[in-house]
Amino acid sequence: MKHIIPFLICALSIINCQFTTANDTIRILCIGNSFSWDAVEQELAPLCDAGKQPIIIGNLYYGGCSLEQHYTFLLKDTASYSFRYIKDGIRTPHEGYSLRQALLLDQWNYISLQQASHDSGIQSSYEPYLGALIDSVRKYQPQAQLCWMQTWSYSQDAKHPAFPRYQKSQQIMDDSIQSATHALLSHHPELMLIPCGEAIKIARSTKLGDTLCRDGYHLSYEYGRYTASCVWYELLTGKNCRCNPYKNDNMTRQQKRLTQKAAHQALQQAKKY
């Protein structure tokens, strides 16, 4: 029976996919940095394609960009971003883009915000910038669902210069990010949580171990990025990511199974926030 139930869930998911049309295209805009690059630029479009879900992805990239920096860029209308636009699986970069330009480019369904990784567990770094960004984004895109992408802790052996803020402890950084997430959602309950950090934490507790990052903080090309994209895929589509047949050529079947399970479990646990 325990094998039949997951099969039935996936079968129903496949049936639902057959009725998706181009009119159901999901449009997401990430106001981010290299961590949103990891989470949405490589694996999300292929996952959506395999799940028969049309998607348009916009990612505003500025390396190490914090909430404070994003808000400063918006106030000054600074064209400092690299804007990566992904449609039909084709990624087109545009340099010298502003946040205002990206907000006006399309009628976005989802717009995500995030904190720079080095400040992700520092609650005092969030405000007043998060609230100000939310208010500003709403003026441009009042219909969009605003999201919060929870980022992940560093690898245990990370050499990131900000790791000492967390006593060079992955556990302390995880706990700090979780506490900061709880706090921001209590102040901004309208935000939809995208628990990528929780998914990476869960995946690290499996046979995969502490191998989800390629350099101590950016996600691995093989299955780190895949894990984060599975969180996005399931949350945006409502389809169980464990039923998605896609995996990249550098993943094993076991890695696919473990990462999909971690993403799904993270979304179940996110309900406690």
Model-derived features: positions:
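Alpha-helical cap/lid subdomain in secreted, periplasmic
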Residues: G96-Y221, E234, C243
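Positively charged n-region of N-terminal signal peptides that target proteins for export
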Residues: M1-I4
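Residues that mark the start of a beta-strand
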Residues: T25-L29, I56
